[in-house]
Amino acid sequence: MKLLILTCLVAVALARPKHPIKHQGLSSEVLNENLLRFVVAPFPEVFRKENINELSKDIGSESIEDQAMEDAKQMKAGSSSSSEEIVPNSAEQKYIQKEDVPSERYLGYLEQLLRLKKYNVPQLEIVPKSAEEQLHSMKEGNPAHQKQPMIAVNQELAYFYPQLFRQFYQLDAYPSGAWYYLPLGTQYTDAPSFSDIPNPIGSENSGKITMPLW
C-alpha cells in the first residue's frame, strides 16, 4: 500500500507543467475584456433600436385603432340619441298639422251657423265674421286660408257653442222651426178674448134641417 501511494505522488509531480500559467502575465485590461465577453451575456437583438422603433410603431397603431373604435361607438351613440330626439319632433309636427286641418264636424257646424243666420235668428248675430270668411275660403279651396290654424276661430266660437247647439240640432231637424224664433224687438199682442169673437151668421132654416133616414 505504501508503495502504491508513493508511485501516485511521483506520477502527479512528473505530470505537473514546468512553465507558469499564461494568464498570470496578462494585463488587467485584457482580463476585464475577457470577463465582459464570456461572463456578461450579449445584448439581445430584440432590444436594438430598429426593433424598438418597430415596437413603438405597433403600439402606436394599436392605440390609434382603439381610439378610432371608441370614436365610432360615440358617433353611433350620438346618432341614436339624435334619432330618438327627431322622432318626437315629427310626432309633434303631425299633431300640429292635425290640429290645423279643420275637421268635417267643424265645417258642418259652420254651415249650420251660416244657414241659420239667414233666418235672422237673433242669437246668431254674435257669430264672428272670421268664421264665415274662413268657411267660404275652405269651400273655394284657397290654400292660404287652409294653412291658417283654426285655434283663433275656435276661441271666438267657444263662448256660445254650449248654448246654441241644442237649438241648432232642433232647427236642423225642423228647418221651419227657425221661424218661431221672433226678433227681440217685436212686441207681443194680447190674444183676443172670447167676447170679441163675432158669432157666426147662419140662415134661419139651418136649425130645421131634417136628416134623411136610411
UniProtKB/Swiss-Prot annotation:
Matching PROSITE patterns:
CASEIN_ALPHA_BETA
The alphabetical list of record keywords is: Milk protein, Phosphoprotein, Secreted, Signal
Of the GO CC terms on this record, one is: extracellular space
Q: Where is this region: Opioid-like peptide sequence?
A: 105-111
Q: Where in the cell is it found?
A: Secreted
State the InterPro entries in the record: Alpha-s1_casein, Casein, Casein_CS
Give the range the annotation lists for the signal sequence.
1-15
The main location class comes to secreted
Coiled-coil zones:
none
Q: Which GO terms describe its biological process?
A: response to 11-deoxycorticosterone; response to dehydroepiandrosterone; response to estradiol; response to progesterone
Residues bearing the modification Phosphoserine: S27, S56, S61, S63, S79, S80, S81, S82, S83, S90, S130
Tissue specificity statement from the Swiss-Prot or TrEMBL entry: Mammary gland specific. Secreted in milk.
Annotated region Disordered: the residues are 69-91
- Intrachain S-S bonds: none
Which family would the database say this protein is a member of? Belongs to the alpha-casein family.
Summarizing the function annotation, the protein's role is: Important role in the capacity of milk to transport calcium phosphate.
Name of protein: Alpha-S1-casein
Q: Which organism is it from?
A: Ovis aries (Sheep)
Gene, per the UniProt record: CSN1S1
